Amino acid sequence: MNAPTVLIMAGGTGGHIMPGLAVADVLRERGWRVLWLGNPDKMEGRLVPPRGIDLVPMHFQGVRGRGVAAMLKLPFLLLRACSQAWGHLTRVRPDVVLGMGGYVAFPGGMMAALRGLPLVVHEQNAVAGTANRWLARLARRVLSGFPDVLPRGEVLGNPVRRDVCALPGPADRYAGRTGPLRMLVVGGSLGAHALNTTLPRALALIDPQARPQVIHQAGAQHQQSLREAYAQAGVPADCRDFIEDMADAMGQADLLVCRAGAMTVAEVAAAGVAALFVPFPHAIDDHQTANARFLSDAQAAWLCPQGELTPEWLADWLRQRTRPELLAVAERARQHARPQAAADIADVCEQAARRPS
């Protein structure tokens, strides 16, 4: 008997690709054949094939914010992409199609629905992306990482790496800690200029005896300027371009200062760590602010708009934080964790594949 086949559609950013890979791992462990519809010239082209998953090529990308000329080309690009998707679906004949977001998912999902194939859509952010808003109308099952995102949406959470889910609980980790607070600053692989410029100046305003210890990850191209900023501020800091074991780093931290991508928010909850979110203000539909509010509205994190993040504000805010308070926030964050999200999404894929068309 041939193994059942899932075609995962996701691309463009790690926020779509990484949760798709987590679901792919679960389905492969259950004996499924996994294929991936994506653009070989984009991030999925670098991340997916090394995981042993065949990439089915789809050359399509979004035009939002690219000007009038790009918008005029959209109908022709979409028609070509739909033609490619139809051909791939005819050849692959998947038992279920899983759309995890990104522009590449739109033509693939449309053609899957037109062919009568079971389509499952998962939206990671608290504000649905363009592709998923359309595909949700056609999908057999609609899943989301946050509540009240899409009509008919079932909240299953966002898949998180297993090493993050495996961390001991906050009470076990925070127990016995003494001395300065341990702060982890994560700007992502490309860094975050607002964090890189504000943190050194804020910490310089705090008495050295009360100043948190800091590990600051900011991307390779920002390392020199970041180290110079801390040196000029007279603040010792462990500056890194990449953190190999992010789960361990989060587990060791009392406080995380970071952006608010969907996967970051999910990992904060899964790890059970206190976090100050500084959402990227130029994210489409300001979805990072909506993501952060899921925890901040529950007193399970803090939210500071980037426009309000000044060295003076941050220094004053840090002076008020205590380890018992951070532990309480971390425990509330973990109450919102969904460690079984990848397995639950895989379950839905299996159910959709078994249901008759």
UniProtKB/Swiss-Prot annotation:
Q: What Gene Ontology terms describe where this protein resides (cellular component)?
A: plasma membrane
Q: What is its EC number?
A: 2.4.1.227
A Pfam family matched in the record: Glyco_transf_28
> Which cell locations does it reside in?
Cell inner membrane
Question: Which residues are noted in the entry as UDP-N-acetyl-alpha-D-glucosamine-binding?
Answer: 13-15, 125, 161, 189, 243, 288
Q: What sort of enzyme, by top EC class, is this?
A: transferase
> How does the entry describe its membrane topology?
Peripheral membrane protein
What coarse category fits the chief subcellular location reported for this protein? membrane
Q: Which GO terms describe its biological process?
A: carbohydrate metabolic process; cell division; cell wall organization; lipid glycosylation; peptidoglycan biosynthetic process; regulation of cell shape
- Pathway(s) annotated for this protein in UniProt: Cell wall biogenesis; peptidoglycan biosynthesis
Domain of life of the native organism: Bacteria
Instruction: List the InterPro entries.
Output: GlcNAc_MurG, Glyco_trans_28_C, GlycoTrans_28_N
Q: Which reaction does it catalyse?
A: di-trans,octa-cis-undecaprenyl diphospho-N-acetyl-alpha-D-muramoyl-L-alanyl-D-glutamyl-meso-2,6-diaminopimeloyl-D-alanyl-D-alanine + UDP-N-acetyl-alpha-D-glucosamine = di-trans,octa-cis-undecaprenyl diphospho-[N-acetyl-alpha-D-glucosaminyl-(1->4)]-N-acetyl-alpha-D-muramoyl-L-alanyl-D-glutamyl-meso-2,6-diaminopimeloyl-D-alanyl-D-alanine + UDP + H(+)
KW Oxidoreductase (keyword) present: no
Molecular function per GO = UDP-N-acetyl-D-glucosamine:N-acetylmuramoyl-L-alanyl-D-glutamyl-meso-2,6-diaminopimelyl-D-alanyl-D-alanine-diphosphoundecaprenol 4-beta-N-acetylglucosaminlytransferase activity; undecaprenyldiphospho-muramoylpentapeptide beta-N-acetylglucosaminyltransferase activity
Keywords on record: Cell cycle, Cell division, Cell inner membrane, Cell membrane, Cell shape, Cell wall biogenesis/degradation, Glycosyltransferase, Membrane, Peptidoglycan synthesis, Transferase
NCBIfam families reported in the protein's UniProt record: murG
What does it do?
A: Cell wall formation. Catalyzes the transfer of a GlcNAc subunit on undecaprenyl-pyrophosphoryl-MurNAc-pentapeptide (lipid intermediate I) to form undecaprenyl-pyrophosphoryl-MurNAc-(pentapeptide)GlcNAc (lipid intermediate II).
- Tell me the protein family, please: Belongs to the glycosyltransferase 28 family. MurG subfamily.
The protein depicted here goes by the name UDP-N-acetylglucosamine--N-acetylmuramyl-(pentapeptide) pyrophosphoryl-undecaprenol N-acetylglucosamine transferase
Q: Which gene encodes it?
A: murG
